[in-house]
Design a protein with these regions (language model features):
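Short, well-formed alpha-helical segments that are part of the catalytic scaffolds
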Residues: 14-27
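Membrane-interface aromatic/basic loop that binds lipid-linked glycans or pyrophosphate carriers
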Residues: 2, 273-337
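Conserved nucleotide-sugar donor-binding catalytic segment
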Residues: 140-234
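A conserved acidic beta->alpha catalytic loop
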Residues: 40-49, 69, 93
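Glycine-rich, basic loop-to-helix element that forms the pyrophosphate-binding segment
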Residues: 67-84, 106
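Short aromatic/hydrophobic "clamp" motif used to bind/position activated sugar donors
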Residues: 89
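Conserved donor NDP-sugar-binding/catalytic core segment of glycosyltransferases
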Residues: 102-137
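Catalytic core of nucleotide-sugar-dependent glycosyltransferases
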Residues: 150, 192-193, 216-224, 229-259, ...
Length: 337
């Protein structure tokens, strides 16, 4: 392999942040060579032009793959992996940025000295794009220097807002993911999947130990619309549904069926129901019922009440009015405090 580390950067319509992302990678000081593999997913703004400028400026480091049509995050990510030359893989999204110039150095040293470790990840902070401030991320469930990976799989399956492993902080062995892609590609590239990190994290945890570094190495961008966050109820419904389907398949693959997974799928059914409720959309409600059946989820009491309301149009409309009143009261309270 030509390079020891391949850093994957996926980007789409991120002309305001992609330069920041690439600069944060190029500042890395590491004793092994690295390359940057950019998957530019057919942006409609100036993102591609910026990426081309960086490729021309750093021809020995940056390789740009400009997609002729939009692939979506999952196919774009795994296509970039297949184009990578490194023994180790890292990634950084086109709106996030690394903050520690020794990130790769710290991580590759652990992988070189611990053959049983399949992945190293670190602490990270949230970055508010509106006021340009950084904030500590929530507490992590596994902060020991090294954890046996199989102990983490259930938590990875049932993670919700905070990832057990923030993949943009990670460095992992390419041999494991390349072998898995060659043997069971559909487990990673299913068109219905909503993200790429769940299956990678579970795979690495199933193949060995996971190392953790408490140093903050990433600013995770928040405040704008992303693949995983949208103010549009239909978009958010679709994302949560697809990601939960991934979790269900991972649970089946690793034969994990526990009270924790049951609570998780039950809660996700409730969340989908709430998206349908707020959108006042009966098709979304029908899809929620189907998800509940497919995921074999236990119906929680709050979900029973929600579905009862939504089965009666008058109750549903009344509930929406009541919710709007509460939202306005909360907004007024925030303004007065």
């Amino acid at each position: 392999m030509e390079n020891k580390i391949s850093v994957i950067v996926l980007t789409f319509n991120q002309e305001d942040t992609i330069g920041r992302t690439l600069d944060s990678i190029l500042m890395q000081r590491c004793h092994v060579p690295y390359e940057i593999v950019i998957g530019e997913d057919c942006s409609t703004d100036g993102t591609l032009d910026i990426c081309r400028q960086y490729e021309r400026k750093h021809p020995g480091i940056i390789r740009l793959f400009a997609n002729k049509k939009n692939k979506g995050v999952v196919d774009n990510y795994f296509d970039c992996i297949l184009e990578s030359h490194g023994q180790y893989i890292a990634d950084c999204a086109g709106d996030d940025f690394w903050t520690d110039p020794l990130k790769l150095e710290k991580e590759v040293s652990i992988l070189e000295n611990n053959p049983n470790v399949t992945l190293v990840h670190t602490n990270w902070e949230s970055y508010n794009e509106q006021d340009k401030s950084s904030h500590a991320s929530p507490d992590k469930p596994f902060t020991a220097p090294i954890t046996q990976g199989y102990q983490m799989i259930e938590a990875i399956i049932t993670q919700r807002k905070v990832p057990v492993i923030q993949l943009c902080t990670s460095l992992y062995r390419s041999s494991i993911i390349l072998k898995a892609l060659s043997e069971e590609e559909s487990s990673f590239r299913d068109k219905s999947f909503g993200c790429e990190d769940l299956q990678v994290a579970a795979l690495m945890a199933s193949h060995g130990d996971i190392a953790y570094i408490p140093d903050v190495t990433l600013n995770y961008s928040e405040g704008g619309e992303t693949v995983s966050y949208s103010l549009d109820h239909h978009k958010q419904f679709s994302f949560v549904k697809r990601v939960t389907y991934q979790s269900f398949l991972i649970a089946q693959h690793y034969h994990i069926n526990s009270p924790a997974t049951d609570r998780f799928f039950s809660q996700r059914v409730f969340e989908l129901g709430m998206f349908a409720f707020r959108a006042h959309d009966r098709q979304m409600l029908a899809e929620t019922f189907q998800c509940e059946k497919d995921w074999q989820a236990t119906r929680a009491t709050k979900t029973r009440w929600l579905f009862t309301v939504m089965r009666h149009e008058v109750l549903w409309r009344t509930g929406l009015i009541v919710r709007q009143v509460f939202v306005k009261i909360k907004q007024l309270h925030r303004q007065l405090v």
